[in-house]
Amino acid sequence: MILKSQQVRSLSPEMDPLRMGMGWTVDDLSKPQIMVESTYGNSHPGSGHLNIFVEEAVRGVNDHGGKAARYFATDMCDGMAQGHDGINYSLAHREAITNLVEAQANATTFDGGVFISSCDKAMPAMLMSIGRMKDMMAAIVVTGGVMEAYDLPAKYTENDPGCAINELLTLEQIGKFSAQYERGEIPAEQLTYYKQHACPSCGACSFMGTASTMQVMAEALGLMLPGTALMPATAPELKQAAYDAGAQLMKLVEAGVTAGDIVDMRSFENAIMVHAAISGSTNALMHVPAIAHEFGFEIDADTFDRMHRGAHYLLNIRPAGDWPAQYFYYAGGVPRIMEEIKSMLHLDAKTVTGKTLGENLEELKKNGFYEHCDALLAEKSKKIGREIKRTDIIRSFDEPIGTNGSIAILRGNLAPEGCVIKHTACPKAMFKATLTARPFDCEEDAIDAILHGRIHPGDAVFIRYEGPRGSGMPEMFYTGEAICSDPTLASSVALITDGRFSGASRGPVIGHVSPEAAAGGPIALVEEGDIIELDVEARRLEITGVKGEHKTPEEMDAILAERKANWKGFTSKYTHGLLKLYSQHAVSAMKGAYME
């Protein structure tokens, strides 16, 4: 087999001296050239430690006959971008990273790549770039794991100081505590203490948000070594996993196996079934279709809805559950989930080990993986002074938390192309509700109304012009937390938007409303006092009346048509730069919100 790197080398006589200018030896030039791409940088805790794993992967490659080159595409942090216009760049920067990695890989041809990241947009961006290069190189993914939870002193535990779960502080709680402070419910000193200890280590945030979900998706797609997603970032096993990934990549290069030889539609269907079992972030409904698109497959939100129906939901991890995300690994991680739901998986799907998914699961049972996880869980039990069973974290298939997956796609005259709700994080009281519309054209106005008592039980808070072609589809996390942290609103008010939500979001929050307001979707036509009907089980979201008076479907159609005729249209505020490009070229959120 003639390596692609050697073919290009013969076409570019400057390549050899340029590489030797960085310390390559003459012998290095003829070795398989491997790209070790990461999002390392001081942008946030999910990327600030990745250089450790970069060096391990480089060593794994070099020790097994390759020559590794370090490349970087530092990502932004959605958490740091919350609450200001920086969050508008979030989805656009997924596209920017994908484009940068594609350019880096093609400008200097490589034979394989190790792709290392941790968080919300970096994980899908890496997977999208692998899809673009699916027939060009071998690929394997390493994640930066998950941060630790902080053990709070008893005086800071909420509600019950004896409850070990509440003593474990994780970042997604800060939005709630901030809203409590704004309402005068906790002092500034207490909020400061929470902030000081919410991120006690590097790694992805310790809840099943978008970062954790996408780490799990990478393993479920077969692109990671089994059992390596969501390891604690400080665990020595993660360093070993990075080294092993570099070594395994060299086997794939030698065998001529590319990512396109591994990932197929079975891989994506497996990932979606795992998503249902873990109650994964709703943002995966944009990321997985975007990744599939790059691999040449078409998946949309309806695929998720269909596969989630009847799926067993097993994972008791925050924000929908009780435990921090680090406990997922202690309970057996992705392999344990797959073992429980294997009757619903394609066990013949290929993976980067060179074996099928089914073969990987059998090997893990033989090599002591689960015993190792059990020992870690026992150690954690001892530390917090409470026995934790594996089934406290990952239920068995026969005793699930629920049997209808975790998300639903709703439709109706308000969302003809659909919208998404994470029903596992929604109070049952809100599964069927009649609400009064309270529309806002930006998140800041909505938050102000909530925090100052202008939103009441039975209201439906609308935030619009926040879709891909509007403001770039930012997260509405703070608005959701402002509602959920208020006991009078948490089970009586819905939040509906053409924007999206953080993976940490909880409560009756409905996002990705399509068509979006900027495209003239019905959400742009909602007026104060409209009657909104929500029915999760029937998958319906409708405008059924105006000013408190119900209308027939035909009457509502006529009213909406008249409003549309008077709609003044939308003019983007972005006149240059990345957000102009993204807002002009992004497809619907229901398709993946990628640029075309």
Where are these regions (language model features)?
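Glycine-/small-residue-enriched capping loops at alpha/beta junctions
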Residues: H49
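Catalytic or ion-coupling anion/metal-binding cores of large enzyme and transporter domains
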Residues: M1-G46, E55-A73, G79, D85-S90, ...
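Well-ordered mid-protein domain cores that form the structural environment of catalytic cofactors
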Residues: S90-T98
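Acidic/charged coordination and interface sites in well-structured regions
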Residues: I52
